[in-house]
Design a protein with these regions (language model features):
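Charged, E/D/K/R/S-rich low-complexity terminal regions of large eukaryotic assembly subunits
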Residues: 2-158
Length: 158
């Protein structure tokens, strides 16, 4: 289940949790760990990245999913942030990725290389991280679109 968390923007977690029998999910010996994993997945899928890192850092009882687990999670977060926002303040981006501001540049480089073509960082200065514009993070209206008149809509509805 932990290995599905870096791909939180897909349905991998739901697919894997459905494979775990109900009596195992309800067993007292895994209840705390499963609850924590559910919380971690919820924080990621809801975009509550800062809370994810807080809970992750407190959950030392969970086994490491893989040696590059945290890097893969950061790449997933970077994909979501870059497809949603064009510019992000450095302090917020560092908090989203669970690192200090002075570690941000190297963390961004590593996460962007893992994310591949899904992320294009234009610049990272002292104040702002800027991503390449896309139709999702910088939507523009279609200048060729003709305005709709009320009479056109009425003829369709009636």
């Amino acid at each position: 289940l932990l290995q599905t968390l870096p791909r939180f923007h897909s349905n991998d977690f739901l697919a894997c949790i459905s494979l775990v029998p109900g009596h195992v999910q309800d067993a007292p010996y895994v209840e705390k760990e499963l609850g924590t994993i559910y919380d971690l997945e919820n924080y990621l899928s809801c975009g509550r990245f800062v809370q994810f890192w807080e809970v992750w850092n407190q959950s030392k009882s969970l086994p490491a999913a893989s040696p590059s687990f945290e890097s893969q999670v950061r790449a997933g977060i970077l994909i979501v942030v870059s497809s949603t926002l064009e510019k992000v303040p450095v302090a917020k981006m560092a908090a989203y990725l669970g690192v200090n501001s002075d570690q941000l540049q190297s963390t961004l480089t590593e996460a962007a290389s893992i994310a591949g073509e899904a992320v294009s960082i234009v610049s990272c200065d002292a104040e702002t991280v800027t991503f390449a514009k896309s139709i999702f993070n910088a939507p523009e209206s279609d200048s060729n679109q003709q305005p709709l008149r009320f009479s056109d809509i009425v003829s369709i509805v009636s």
